[in-house]
Amino acid sequence: MFCTERQVCVRQFTQFCNVTKETIEIGAVFMYNVTIRVSEPTWKEGSFPKGELTTMYTVNAIRNICLLGHSGSGKSALAESLLYMTGAIDRMGKNADGNTVCDSDPEEIRRHISISTAVVPLEYKNTKINVLDTPGAFDFSGAVMEALRAADAAILVLSAKDGITVGFEKAWKYCEERNMPRFVYISKVDEDNSDYNATFNALREKYGNKIAPVVVPIWDESKRVIGIIDVLNKRAYEMQKLKRVEIEIPEGKEAVITEFNDALKEAVAETDEELMDRFFEGDDFTYAEMIKGLYTGVRELSLFPVLCGSAVSCLGSLMLMDSVLDLLPNPVQGNYHKATKADGTTEEFVVSPGGVPSAYVWKTVSDQYGKYSYIKVLSGEITPDTTLINARTGESEKLGRMYVMCGKKATEVKALGCGDIGALGKMDKVRTGDTLCDPRKVVSLKQIPYAPPCYSMAIAPKVKGQEDKVGTGLNRLNEEDPSFTLVNNAETHQMVISGQGDQQLDVLVSKLKSRFGVDAELMPAKIAYREKIKKTVEAHGRHKKQTGGSGQFGDVWIRFSPQEEQDELIFDVEVVGGAVPKNFNPAVEKGIQEAILKGPLAGYPMVGLKAVLYDGSYHPVDSNEMAFKMAAILAYKEAMPNAMPTLLEPVGSLAVTIPDSYMGDVIGDLNKRRGRIMGMNPDNAGNTVVDAEVPMAEMATYAIDLRAMTQARGSFTLTFERYEEVPKQYQDKIIADAKND
């Protein structure tokens, strides 16, 4: 990495070089023309001095990055490698052994996957890098949305064994939607069956010349990766006992390096018209021009550097961190936010170290022992004595104890500076998405855009009488995972939990037991069917009871008929001659209202019914409201079996977004679900949106089934549309199931 008479980034070399010429300002990065004296650096790779996590860094010396990618692509292993290479840990853990820093939750250890975002701070070359390791499993996309709110840039991880996966495509889309600067890191380059070239070429084919190779592997004669090449400097490195060592470029590899260097130059040329002209003229670019082009391209989203390595051997980890420092934005240069003021107007909220204190709560951890509110300081500096206003509630909040988190380990600190990420303890009234502001400037940043829940199940305790414990536990879990919803359905008498998939709900059930000591089980959510009659009938109801003294007497004739005006009962009176006194009419209506809560077929509510009281009789002594109410119920029960009752089912409006290649499978599946295709239209991303109407009873597992059919590339929305009659061949089973319940 050391050379003579080369222009280099000052952050990497000021500790062992002499500045000889003028400073050139490039955006927010300062570059120098320097003369390098080959000498021993003041730090040694693999043995960096461990900085105190309690150190408060200036905003320019902070990077907040999130690791995104498909499940199993190597994100947590990469974070472990970075921790080791910066001296934060003495030994790297393994996911299979359940001893990594990032996956410390008991459920993560048991399942060998990440289910929430872990924060691991690194201290490297006087800079703090907050790494946010996100889950790759789609069921836990809510945690990814939270991390994207806190990060200023992203590293998209994909495996050289698997190539571009749907998880990588989704991560790229998330970054595109947020205009987030990003790197691509190709992992596992030294493992069997890996194919770096195929993976890189696939990136180039999909995303064009914006893909810029910065670090590439070196292979030996047996196609085994033995090291990496810094394309910009044309230098080669290998790992020896987890130490990086510079090596000679292997014989015959010069052409490969030149090829990748030309590809990098082409990508840099895309960032500037003058550079593009010079590129076509065959001119070489100086090192400073290459760095400037890379930096500009990353910031303007016109260039995406590609690095590679192996987390197991730590190959490429140092070069990745160097690139993070040199090319990715600090919090001031990163994401801008839309803020809503107290009067409802919006403004650009700019991260500012000199502004009044403010912070955004982007994540919550809540268990039986307490609560941590993870924050990103957006402006100013905060201390335990700082009092801020919660923009959502309007209440004052004294911050109290503050921490820097590293996995599950909390280290108390005395202050957090602008742009940094930390946590607040025991903020009971604060929740994810809250903006904490100085009273002089109260603004609210927008909420985190969680995906709408698409998979629902009923949940109940295994031991009756513990329903309140289940509800209390789920409400606590909802504090740390707002991506799921919980509804008590009064009609079906079920507690219904909705999320992104079966894995998410299964984790919640496991956490109920481990954290709150309550055993619960999932079961299909009942469908809220309705009943309706198709024929007009007349019925007589008489309630007569004599028990000594005054008795009860009520006698009614009622005409029941179907109506389409509304779901609610329409009640009318056509009695003439005072056969039923008017003061008993409300009792008759009340009796019918009670009766229609249960239909004659399966006990589902009756809808679309009209009832006309047209005759009856009364007793001057024994008639009362209760007697006429009971008479109306008897008339209803007599009439319904003769009125051609039928079942109605809820029908939903479905919009499925899929690549065209899955069209046949999706359409065929919808037909099996009794769906009606209403139309097909292209969207702006080159996919097709299939509009359909489908019975809700057929959609219980659709989220899982669509994921399987489309390799998780499909998405859908489903909203209730109306009730329709259930085909006769399906009614008998529904009725039988209802009676069994």
Residue ranges and their predicted role:
Residues 7, 22-25, 44:
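Charged/polar low-complexity intrinsically disordered segments
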Residues 13, 23-25, 35:
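Generic short N-terminal amphipathic or hydrophobic helices
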Residues 32-34, 42, 49-741:
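Structural and coupling elements of P-loop NTPases
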